[in-house]
Curated annotation (Swiss-Prot):
Protein name stated in the entry: ATP-dependent Clp protease ATP-binding subunit ClpA homolog CD4B, chloroplastic
Subcellular location: Plastid, Chloroplast
Residues annotated as domain Clp R: 92-234
Family: Belongs to the ClpA/ClpB family.
Binding-site residues for ATP, renumbered to this chain: 300-307, 643-650
An MF annotation (GO) of this entry: ATP hydrolysis activity
Species this protein is from: Solanum lycopersicum
Span list, region I: 255-502
Claim: Repressor is one of the keywords in the record: no
Organism phylogeny: Eukaryota, Viridiplantae, Streptophyta, Embryophyta, Tracheophyta
Annotated stretches, region: Repeat 1: 95-160
Length: 923
């Protein structure tokens, strides 16, 4: 594109006159351009250098930078035949990126039409196609679009031959437009050439094809010029008011492009109100009033309101409630991502940043706010280049640049503290997390904004619930951010609920879709009579749906008018959002759930036979937690279940998970025999840095983070290494544990159950006196004696600080023969269910059941021998018969024991045996 400018017959005199003006290049480049401009004759023609002199001239001119403008202009210095003329680089240094884009689009339009030149008409198409500049906006407001303009251009000049050179030259009129655009910029007091100046130059030239195109499209050139001047004036006023500092009125394109004026937004009322944070805002004001190193850096956890402090300062400045040191200043937030974006060539980023710093220094009324200030480090750095932090350091130290930074504690430590030279230039301002009471006040200040957005109302109870519930249940985020998110999502939920179609309308919509589908099929099948009937039905349904929607809107409108500003968000909505986020039930207990909780022991006893003490203790803990009476800073409950093997310690935890938490999989189970060695203990919280598995997290901490409301079972706790007990002290007391990455995991909504076989030998010795021959009082006294002995054993095995943190130590009883018989019924039912899947009906006789209990009863081993007896006597016999094809799908089978004690399997479809079996007992 730039080579096309070489075709100029003379250097514009206005450009040649720029020899004495400021030139944005190195000293060497300035001298080269001055030399070339001075070498012109009175007609301002310049003969190209040849040979070695030409190469040197090229090198001298091109080696000045890598900006977009210089890239375009550099192409003009390549060797050309004698008599060739070009536009000097100084003109392109003044082009904005939008103006460069216009010229490039003009070339594309020339190629599209097959023309080997760029005239005024192509520049006009480029101005329209650019789309975002002042020129494009004015032309669009006049009703001129790219499609119509292309048609008019093609009507006037037609299409070219199709052969287009790589370098398309500019026509003399197009060069005249460029010259006039520079003059227009000077007259407006601008030190740059934008798309608006190109349009003004185009209108001023007034004799090219572009003028005819505008005339044909019905646009008045004088009206266009007036609109451009007006928009340029408004832009200047806006920039002067928001960036330039009022009196100077100078335009600051770099700051305007990469920054957002918070003070202007505050004046327009577009910022959320800032409640509290007075000490932090005053400290920031004090630091900004210093002579040097006047750069505060807001440091705090994510979501505590660091950006809000900068917005609060902008609001104070807008209201005039600040000391004279910063009165009238503008807070501009800098978008670092936008500043870096698109810098493809070396030097572009540095040039943008230097321009931005120059504009801030010239204004002397700008306070720069950089959110995520740690992104300065490394921004724009490439091989051999320096990053943004090092470019800004001198200005930050001397007080030439007032900058407010904001970053998190981790990022500050990771990036800024590693660079002491940068750290000393920023003065840290700690931003603590607000308390629950402060958060409630913040929510009250924001309430009006969210009510307007969601078109509903919040009560004070909603705001209190949002602050308290978010503090209690959402542990991995910080106030006030998580509380604000709660009321925001609750408002969205209520609004969507009220905006839904009534059920009747949904049914009609479903029917309408089906009828439309049938109508289309009828049309395709050329059954037009049926299609006509369906069309009539379709129109009828549409009318009904429209009537229902209108009626629903009227009802909603009436409700809104009755409630002043719309639906009401309730505390239950806030609770529902917390539950959906965390999985923790915080809603009020419903009638059905209340009945379930009251009958919890009865339900658990359908699976757990005996062990009343343990079942009652767990049920009490769940009820206490569900109604909100538990200590909010400790787990729901922590138990240690001790007793002989096979009496239901682990089974009770599984039954609780299945009944109350949904399934056995909802339980987090850790077999402590896997943590017997010292080096395996770290698996609970994650490997330390430098070890394999560091990034994966701990088995315990990660499981609880994903499912904070659950049962955690530490099976066979006495098998664990003693270091595990040290780790569990803070879980049992404070309900928290820090993993290997320093993240705090919340155990306040978990039920901790530890099982142990410590004391089983004592129970076995004393168990001989527990049986059918003892009455109730003797059983209780024997159990109490054994319980005290087991407790002593536990005290000898575990350290006192560990046992002292447990809520209860529950000793399980040995199973009696009657209890084993009930357990046998439960186990047999499980076998029946497995066979029912295979369509085999199984029944057992009373004799068989007694045989199973006799073989499976062992007071020392609990119910596990019973499981082995059922497997040997029933499952093995059934498996042999099924493999021998004696039992098939659909058969009814009775299992009995003959007079010799052998198990017999009787198939109901194979006839009656000679010795009839007794009546089967349903289990």
């Amino acid at each position: 594109m730039a080579r096309a400018l070489v075709q100029s017959t003379s250097i514009p005199s206005s450009v040649a006159g720029e020899r004495t003006t400021k030139f944005n290049g190195s000293g060497k480049t300035k001298r080269a351009v001055t030399m070339l401009c001075n070498a012109q004759s009175s007609s301002l023609t310049l003969r190209d250098f040849t040979g070695l002199r030409g190469c040197n001239a090229i090198d001298t001119l091109v080696r000045s930078g890598e900006t977009l403008q210089s890239k375009v202009a550099a192409a003009t210095y390549v060797r050309r035949p004698r008599g060739c003329r070009f536009v000097p680089k100084a003109m392109f240094e003044r082009f904005t990126e939008k103006a460069i884009k216009v010229i490039m689009l003009a070339q594309e339009e020339a190629r599209r039409l097959g023309h080997n030149f760029v005239g005024t008409e192509q520049i006009l198409l480029g101005l329209i196609g650019e789309g975002t500049g002042i020129a494009a906006k004015v032309l669009k407001s006049m009703g001129i679009n790219l499609k119509d303009a292309r048609v008019e251009v093609e009507k006037i000049i037609g299409r070219g031959s199709g052969f287009v050179a790589v370098e398309i030259p500019f026509t003399p009129r197009a060069k005249r437009v460029l010259e006039l655009s520079l003059e227009e910029a000077r007259q407006l007091g601008h030190n740059y050439i934008g798309s608006e100046h190109l349009l003004l130059g185009l209108l001023r030239e007034g004799e090219g094809v572009a003028a005819r195109v505008l005339e044909n499209l019905g646009a008045d050139p004088s009206n266009i010029r007036t609109q451009v001047i007006r928009m340029v004036g408004e832009s200047n006023e806006a920039v002067g008011a928001s960036v330039g500092g009022g009196t100077s009125g100078q335009k600051m394109p770099t700051l305007e492009e990469y920054g957002t004026n918070l003070t202007k937004l505050a004046e327009e009322g577009k910022l959320d109100p800032v409640v509290g944070r007075q000490p932090q805002i005053e400290r920031v004001t004090q630091i900004l009033g210093r002579r040097t190193k006047n750069n505060p850096c807001l440091i705090g956890e994510p979501g505590v309101g660091k950006t809000a402090i900068a917005e609060g300062l902008a609001q104070r400045i807008a209201n005039g409630d600040v000391p004279e040191t910063i009165e009238g200043k503008k807070v501009i937030t800098l978008d670092m991502g936008l500043l870096v974006a698109g810098t493809k060539y070396r030097g572009e980023f540095e040039e943008r940043l230097k321009k931005l710093m120059e504009e801030i220094k010239q204004s002397d009324e700008i306070i720069l706010f950089i959110d995520e200030v740690h992104t300065l480090i490394g921004a724009g750095a490439a091989e051999g280049a320096i990053d943004a932090a090092n470019i800004l350091k001198p200005a930050l130290a001397r007080g030439e640049l007032q900058c407010i930074g904001a970053t998190t504690l981790d990022e500050y430590r990771k990036h800024i503290e590693k660079d002491p030279a940068l750290e000393r230039r920023f003065q840290p301002v700690k931003v603590p997390e607000p308390t629950v009471d402060e958060t409630i006040q913040i929510l009250k200040g924001l309430r009006e904004r969210y009510e307007i957005h969601h078109k509903l109302r919040y009560t004070d109870e909603d705001l209190v619930a949002a602050a308290q519930l978010s503090y209690q249940y959402i542990s991995d985020r910080f106030l006030p951010d998580k509380a604000i998110d709660l009321i925001d999502e609750a408002g969205s939920r209520v609004r969507l609920r009220h905006a839904q179609l009534p059920e009747e309308a949904k049914e009609l919509e479903k029917e309408l879709r089906q009828i439309t589908k049938e109508k289309n099929e009828a049309v395709r099948g050329q059954d037009f009579e049926k299609a006509g009937e369906l069309r009539d039905r379709e129109m009828d349904l549409k009318a009904q749906i429209t009537a229902l929607i209108d009626k629903n809107k009227e009802v909603s409108k009436a409700e809104s008018e009755a409630a002043d500003t719309g639906p009401l968000v309730t505390e239950a909505d806030i609770q529902h959002i917390v539950s959906s986020w965390t999985g923790i039930p915080v809603e009020k207990v419903s009638t059905d759930e209340s009945d379930r909780l009251l009958k919890m022991e009865e339900t658990l006893h359908t699976r757990i036979i005996g062990q009343d003490e343990a079942v009652k203790a767990i049920s009490r803990a769940i009820r206490r937690a569900r109604v909100g009476l538990k200590n909010p800073n400790r787990p729901i409950a922590s138990f240690i279940f001790s007793g002989p093997t096979g009496v239901g310690k682990s089974e009770l935890a599984k039954a609780l998970a299945a009944y109350y938490f949904g399934s056995e999989e909802a339980m987090i189970r850790l077999d402590m025999s896997e943590f017997m060695e010292r080096h395996t203990v770290s698996k609970l919280i994650g490997s330390p840095p430098g070890y394999v598995g560091y990034t994966e997290g701990g088995q315990l901490t990660e499981a609880v983070r994903r499912r904070p409301y659950t049962v955690v079972l530490f099976d066979e706790i006495e098998k664990a290494h003693p270091d595990v007990f040290n780790m569990m002290l803070q879980i049992l007391e404070d309900g928290r544990l820090t993993d290997s990455k320093g993240r705090t995991v919340d155990f306040k909504n978990t039920l901790l159950i530890m099982t142990s076989n410590v004391g089983s030998s004592v129970i076995e010795k004393g168990g001989r006196r527990i049986g059918f021959d003892l009455d109730l009082d003797e059983k209780d006294s024997s159990y109490n004696r054994i319980k005290s002995l087991v407790t002593e054993e536990l005290k000898q095995y575990f350290r006192p600080e560990f046992l002292n943190r447990l809520d209860e130590m529950i000793v399980f009883r040995q199973l009696t023969k009657l209890e084993v018989k009930e357990i046998a019924d439960i186990m047999l039912k499980e076998v029946f269910e497995r066979l029912k899947v295979k369509e085999i009906e199984l029944q057992v006789t009373e004799r068989f059941r007694d045989r199973v209990v006799d073989e499976g009863y062992n007071p020392s081993y609990g119910a596990r021998p019973l499981r082995r007896a059922i497997m040997r006597l029933l499952e093995d016999s059934m498996a042999e018969k099924m493999l021998a094809n004696e039992i098939k799908e659909g058969d009814s089978v009775i299992v009995d024991v003959d007079s010799d004690g052998n198990v017999t399997v009787l198939n109901g479809s194979s006839g009656t045996p000679s010795d009839p079996a007794p009546e089967p007992i349903p289990v």
